[in-house]
Amino acid sequence: MENISNKSLPAIITDVADRYWQRLNEAWPELSTLIDKKHCDELYRIMGVSDFIAEQLCRHPDWIPALFDGQLVKVERLSFDRELHELMEPCRSEDEAKAILRCYRNRLMVRLAWRDFFGYVSLEDSLLDLSALSEALIIAGRDWLYRELCQQYGTPCDREGNPQPLMVIGMGKLGGRELNFSSDIDLIFTFPEHGETQGGRRALDNQQFFIKMGQRLVNLLHQVTVDGFVYRVDMRLRPYGESGPLVVSFSALEDYYQEQGRDWERYAMVKARALGPWTAFSDELHSMLRPFVYRRYIDFSAIESLRKMKQLITQEVRRRKLTDNIKLGAGGIREVEFVVQSFQLIRGGREPSLRQQSLFAAIDTLYTLGQLEYLAVDDLKQSYLLLRRVENLLQAIGDRQTQTLPDNGLDWYRLCHCMGMASEAELRTHIESAMSKIHRHFNDTVGGNEQDESSQLWTQQLWSVQEDEHAQALISEQSIEDPDLWPMLKSWRDTIAKRSIGPRGRDTLDKLMPWLLRELTPLVSPSKAFEPVSKVLDQILTRTTYLELLYENPGARQQLVSLCCASPWISAQLAKFPMLLDELIDPAQLYDTTSLDDYGSELRQYLLRVPEEDMEQQMEGLRQFKLSQQLKIAAADVTGVLPVSQVSNHLTLLAEAIIEQVVMQAWLQVSSRHGVPTHLDEGDMGFAVIGYGKAGGIELGYGSDLDLVFLHSYSRERFPENTETNGERPIEVGHFYLKLAQRILHLFSTRTNSGELYEVDMRLRPSGASGLLVSEIEHFGQYQREEAWTWEHQALVRARFMFGDNALSSRFSTLRSEVLQLHREKETLAQEVREMRLKMREHLLKVSPDMFDLKQSAGGIADIEFIAQYLVLANANEHSELSIWSDNIRIFSTLGELALLPQLDAQELIQAYLFLRDENHRLTLQQKPGQLALELVELHAQRVIEIYQNVLEF
């Protein structure tokens, strides 16, 4: 390919170059006298194609003479470490260290980008240099911080007194020495042995030492200052993701991967590499990780894992509307990586030569071993090189992490100019050809799912027929007795004919509909089934990718029809949020609900696909995860795969996982501006979320809101010296927790493309809507003991700790038990509970005499809940075990065991409660109000009324 030095610049680029040239001459008037015309011409050209280089040189014109004195052609990557060591050695403050690292990074990046634009070096050499620079900067920062912290806390040592280092594992392209120009860096921090520091004022546990060091290292590299940043650092690939410790020991790392390591983590670990000078610890670390990554047998399960991972990426591309993405799209950079890594995982256990981080080296080894043909290797390498060069140049234009082709004319001109292409169309042709080759080899490796388009279906004729008689004859020939089918189909077809869906969309719809009709016509009432399906189609007519999804995936079509027939609620969800159609592709996965213990880890893994700093996409990711998991629960519910008794457990544990991530995101956002309260121990937040009502009772339904109360641990009396946060904009600690609570509510309530996360009701907090949004925990306890009404103690029966520090969990449990165990006069209590129940019924019960409101009618859910709450408040003073549970089922079981309620009554209340809740779930999925004909519930309701009267009306 040509380079830019041999071509005249398009006018759109010279306009940019002129502006920068003027700025540079103003900053450095003697420019033209110090460099010759040839170099001036080259400088002018580079300023036209790269905003990053132009901005840096306008700020640092003194770099220019050295660039033309041999620095452009020759970059000695082996000298990076030495140069940085010399620069960092005299450094005495963190601010100074940040400035040194950023200045060095920017100066070297200018050199490396300049070489790329002019084609002075091969792409392979450029990637090696970018990776070496990144590694040198990380290690320089690490080593400087290690010296600083050792002076402050002493040297971390094992139990024999041997010094322990912080090991940094480079993941992804950094590990493979193939880093992009403006990539973020995925790191994992670890250390060899537990122990404590020696030589400091007081001994500090090694893990605490390295966590402090890790936090400061991330900040040293990641923080944006006046000089920019060194690298965007992503630590989410560490064990347990964001909820795990920032740094763990070798043994903890090994235990995690042996016991909990997932398939995607195996793929990630293929490129894992200990950064910095190679030591015995590096050997130990790689030897320890190898059995997890490379199995001793030939491991074909890797292919299935790859399919699932690719499916997730494809879904993400659709959901985020990532068009023109040369990394994640079909045939993109990621597919080359998947092809090579799948072979490495399958055969790496038997073939040590495949255990390498570099894609270039691994693909050559695959050819040597006969695993890939020469033509496949050549196609993959040349196509990969083209896409990586495009990616590198795109990022070097503005030092932005992007893999998306330009959306503006200027950057297209720049890219075409640097690639030696005459036009956008010519470059697109080359890119599309490369991606087509990659995708073909990817499908050869993992298996494709193309559909036979030649199948001739009678439904094809039905979809295209114009005459009513012909259509009715076709339907009659199939013995379908549904007079509404053709009128409904024709009406819908005529309606969508008026809509503008584009030629590609129209063509895909015409291919899809015969197959979809083949799913519908065998049903008892095809027209009835078509109605909800058509509403889903209405929403995706202009989103061709979803039409293509249904066309290309028979399983997705089958599930669409099946679920729309089974539940109007599900069909409404699919119509409102078409991205859920992705979940229908794999029926086995759709009906395999996440285990109750795994919602947290699944959500953390899901959010790994979203840039940590992209708050909008993080919010969208939370909502999409909730929607997809709710769909799986509902699908398993309506088909009987999931027992109805388990539905609320799943919906509640899903909410808990989301609450955890919302609080953590809110914490990051608030603390990034204001720092954190200084009274906290390392890793603590001093904050808790308490669930009330259905959330507290583990009884959430589809569409339930969350009744929450927020607590914190700070008080001026206990921490008089820690009144403010420690950030650049410190604020009073109470104000910090108020901002945190407000941010949490914002994250829950903001309506994105995927809707609202949850509606949150905070009215059960102390003093209700007029009270503080977040309460100090001891004030909360005092309020409950001295000011709370009986109905607030009833609510406390169903309160449960849902997220927060262990110390707060323990304290809340104690306070709750103390309040529930207060002595109460039973007659007075019974009267207050009855009066509250009567007020509720008068205010909320709106149903005709022949209907039964599952919640509010006499003998309904509310009566059962009030029985449980009264009996706990009346008897917990003498039976402390009654204050343990927050859910009604276990409360009634305990009451029966204690003989405070006859065993038969306890069992009948449990059965009635489960029946009413199950019916409520069923009616929600049918999008019907929570009411049944009175005769259907009369037996259950009558027994509840009798028990209610026996317990409360004495």
From Swiss-Prot:
It comes from the Bacteria. Keywords: ATP-binding, Magnesium, Multifunctional enzyme, Nucleotide-binding, Nucleotidyltransferase, Transferase. Belongs to the GlnE family. HAMAP family: GlnE (MF_00802). Involved in the regulation of glutamine synthetase GlnA, a key enzyme in the process to assimilate ammonia. When cellular nitrogen levels are high, the C-terminal adenylyl transferase (AT) inactivates GlnA by covalent transfer of an adenylyl group from ATP to specific tyrosine residue of GlnA, thus reducing its activity. Conversely, when nitrogen levels are low, the N-terminal adenylyl removase (AR) activates GlnA by removing the adenylyl group by phosphorolysis, increasing its activity. GO terms for molecular function: [glutamate-ammonia-ligase] adenylyltransferase activity; [glutamine synthetase]-adenylyl-L-tyrosine phosphorylase activity; ATP binding; magnesium ion binding. It catalyses: [glutamine synthetase]-O(4)-(5'-adenylyl)-L-tyrosine + phosphate = [glutamine synthetase]-L-tyrosine + ADP; [glutamine synthetase]-L-tyrosine + ATP = [glutamine synthetase]-O(4)-(5'-adenylyl)-L-tyrosine + diphosphate. This is Bifunctional glutamine synthetase adenylyltransferase/adenylyl-removing enzyme. Residues 456-954 are annotated as: Adenylyl transferase. The keyword ATP-binding applies. Residues 1-450 are annotated as: Adenylyl removase. Gene3D superfamilies: 1.20.120.1510, Beta Polymerase, domain 2, Glutamine synthase adenylyltransferase GlnE, Nucleotidyltransferases domain 2. GO terms for biological process: regulation of glutamine family amino acid metabolic process. Its EC number is 2.7.7.89, 2.7.7.42. InterPro entries: GlnE, GlnE_rpt_dom, NT_sf, PII_UdlTrfase/GS_AdlTrfase. Pfam families: GlnD_UR_UTase (PF08335), GlnE (PF03710). Its cofactor is Mg(2+). PANTHER family: BIFUNCTIONAL GLUTAMINE SYNTHETASE ADENYLYLTRANSFERASE_ADENYLYL-REMOVING ENZYME (PTHR30621:SF0), GLUTAMINE SYNTHETASE ADENYLYLTRANSFERASE (PTHR30621). The gene is glnE. GO terms for cellular component: cytosol.
